[in-house]
UniProtKB/Swiss-Prot annotation:
Top-level taxon of the source organism: Bacteria
Keyword Phosphoprotein included in the entry's annotation: no
Family to which this protein belongs: Belongs to the ABC transporter superfamily.
Example of a GO cellular component annotation carried by this entry: membrane
Classification via SMART domains: AAA (SM00382)
Ranges where the ABC transporter domain occurs: 5-235
Keyword terms: ATP-binding, Nucleotide-binding, Transport
Keyword ATP-binding attributed: yes
GO terms for biological process, alphabetical: transmembrane transport
Organism, scientific name: Escherichia coli (strain K12)
GO molecular function, one term: ATP binding
Name of the protein in its database record: Uncharacterized ABC transporter ATP-binding protein YdcT
Amino acid sequence: MTYAVEFDNVSRLYGDVRAVDGVSIAIKDGEFFSMLGPSGSGKTTCLRLIAGFEQLSGGAISIFGKPASNLPPWERDVNTVFQDYALFPHMSILDNVAYGLMVKGVNKKQRHAMAQEALEKVALGFVHQRKPSQLSGGQRQRVAIARALVNEPRVLLLDEPLGALDLKLREQMQLELKKLQQSLGITFIFVTHDQGEALSMSDRVAVFNNGRIEQVDSPRDLYMRPRTPFVAGFVGTSNVFDGLMAEKLCGMTGSFALRPEHIRLNTPGELQANGTIQAVQYQGAATRFELKLNGGEKLLVSQANMTGEELPATLTPGQQVMVSWSRDVMVPLVEER
């Protein structure tokens, strides 16, 4: 099978710092693939390595089966969209999108036709004569995407492109990006530190930590079956039981993750514990409770909010509660390297 992008034991060193440390991944053609991780985890460096903006310290990269480690950026079948859209303020939107084609020597009539077509793909064909200052943040983002698409890349690289947008616009752009990727059928590689973005748009997600990949999986499997304590804590919220806590509370050997929404309050169950509510956080669709169990352990519990229901007086800070859960919702974890 020929992959869109393949890393074979790739490393990138800055002095003694291993920004990317022995990463191997295979990204499929036509896949929406996200690289998720905290700042400094290596995800953006990997994107820059694909684009050719960084040089490898070790390993190899191939793009559609062709060795790409030593290719200059302009010879790689990829284009990049950055968080800073870098639009030319004095140019029309049409000329902004057509700029790369002008540099390549494409004649004006042809490049304007291609730029207009790219704008149509992102539903902005009507703004071609405007200036960037006349557009909203979301529209400028789509212009930046059109400018990348006009070169007809087989892989589109997106480096935290939604980070500058407000929450509602960011959520709207997530839907639009996914629809665009599906309609184009090309590979999108999306870098983000936002788990919500990665889970909502991606076919698969690679979770980065300290220059390495902790897990590559579908969004559902990442959430429901995290493999390491880091993934369990970074993708969503988890209660992580180390060996001592698992043995004490559950009679089980090893480390486990338990999602807060899988714990029931004041309802008997297979495994039970008692504790005191320390804090209550109303979060709209759910309420989160921070508990201190009688043995001193801390536990997070999330309870869905039913329409019109008030929080019972028995579920306020200082109140004693019983919690329960089942063994089958506890996810075994492997120790981090």
